[in-house]
């Protein structure tokens, strides 16, 4: 377990972009691109010799292409054996980084899911309270009576209320007012 933490905190390995990786691999194994370039040059020269109808030069260039490909393959195998342990460590490091990123992504997803669930639960509770208030006329009248008492005490400072008629009787007492009272009652 300690070696995994050391592997993640090791200054030897760090996350790199594709260009950084290309440059690093070019510095580690410069013979592979050299062999590829030699192969391409031999093919180009063989093509030019074929166009010039020089079959001797063309055959010579095709042999040079085979030698260049052998050299490239040899460089790949030798580099693979030489950098075997480092590549294994780097793969392990990259695997750990990917696991960490996947875990962070999963945790963020779970947090979002919990927030949505909490929001949905709150909506269901509000919906249940509204349904109960709408279905229970006794509860509505009790809520309306409680609201009238609050208005008389001057506790209710809501500007967006229906205007009151003369004589203190409020116009528009109904389900909407009951719902507002329920919501306000839960906030207090």
Swiss-Prot record:
Its annotated compartments are: Mitochondrion membrane
Q: Pfam families, from UniProt?
A: HIG_1_N
> Which is a Gene Ontology cellular component entry for this protein?
mitochondrial membrane
Keyword Membrane found: yes
Biological process GO annotation list? mitochondrial respirasome assembly
Keyword Mitochondrion among record annotations: yes
Matches recorded under InterPro entries: Hypoxia_induced_domain, RCF1
Question: Where is this protein chiefly located?
Answer: mitochondrion
Give the UniProt keywords, A-Z: Coiled coil, Membrane, Mitochondrion, Transmembrane, Transmembrane helix
Protein topology in the membrane = Multi-pass membrane protein
Q: Subunit structure, per the record?
A: Associates with the respiratory chain complex III/complex IV supercomplex.
**UniProt family annotation:** Belongs to the RCF1 family.
> What does the record give as the function of this protein?
Cytochrome c oxidase subunit which plays a role in assembly of respiratory supercomplexes.
What is the protein's name according to its record? Respiratory supercomplex factor 1, mitochondrial
Organism of origin is Talaromyces stipitatus (strain ATCC 10500 / CBS 375.48 / QM 6759 / NRRL 1006) (Penicillium stipitatum)
